[in-house]
Amino acid sequence: MRIGILETDQVPKDLIEDFGTYADMVEAWLRQERREFLFSRYDVVQEIYPQDISECDAYLITGSRASVYDHDPWLCTLSQFIRDIYMQSTKKLIGICFGHQLIVQSLGGVVYKSPKGWGVGLAQSEVYKTEPWMIPLAKSFKLPVIHQDQVIELPKDATAIAGNPFCPYSVVTYGGSVLTFQGHPEHKKTYTQALMLRRKDVMEETVFSAGLRSLDDDPDAQLVAKWVVNFLEE
């Protein structure tokens, strides 16, 4: 299987040596479950796309510092690409954080900066609905998060299958072809911590401190990798 990674941002230059690019993170995360997966990378901020959707078996949209409600031209192009994939429904599509939000917005949902403020650290989501590909079974799971924007209203064909009081729409599906996560299963805890430290001045101290403490636990990245691989291969 070949996964097309649609890169929507760059890792800060001083962190690349330790953590790699966002595509590197995605590849390492998924290859712990499927070493034979192949990957192609597309810098969609620079309007670089596959010449044809058939180039890859599935696509994944990464996280980004951008907001989905900005009006940059590359966002409009990517939104149309999302709709094209969804309408064809022959390719699986995965969204992470920004990718999760942009897919929701592109398909008719609503995203904006939440009045609840920052979500940072390890966030636990409760499973509302268990899908067949969610093996091993789990009632809840934890993933790194760092976001202010979040999904406020789902598209009519979408279903929230996991969430929490702070972020009710943490995981969303659209039939059998689209799966999106607000959390970052591809992020190491140390990368989340590095991003938090860079943004400490714009967070409330209590939120920042609680987020750091939460990183004492371990994320369920491998569990979610199993789920995503099952979803892609079903």
Where are these regions (language model features)?
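N-terminal beta1-alpha1 cap of cysteine-dependent amidohydrolase-like domains
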Residues: M1-P73, T77-M87, S209-E234
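Amide-donor transfer/coupling interface in amidating biosynthetic enzymes
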Residues: R2-T8, P12-L15, M25, M87, ...
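Short, glycine/charged-enriched secondary-structure capping and boundary segments
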Residues: D18-T21, S54-C56, P73-C76, L107-V111, ...
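Short, polar loop motifs at secondary-structure junctions
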Residues: Q32, V45-Q46, G99, Q148-Q150, ...
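Conserved beta-strand segments of alpha/beta enzyme cores
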Residues: L38-S40, V110, K142, T159
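Conserved beta-strand termini and adjacent loop/short-helix elements that scaffold enzyme active sites
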Residues: Y42-V44, S114, I146, G163
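A short acidic, often aromatic-flanked loop/helix-cap motif at beta-alpha or helix-coil junctions
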Residues: Q46-P50, G119-V120, I152, P168-Y169
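Cysteine-nucleophile active-site neighborhood
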Residues: T62-E131
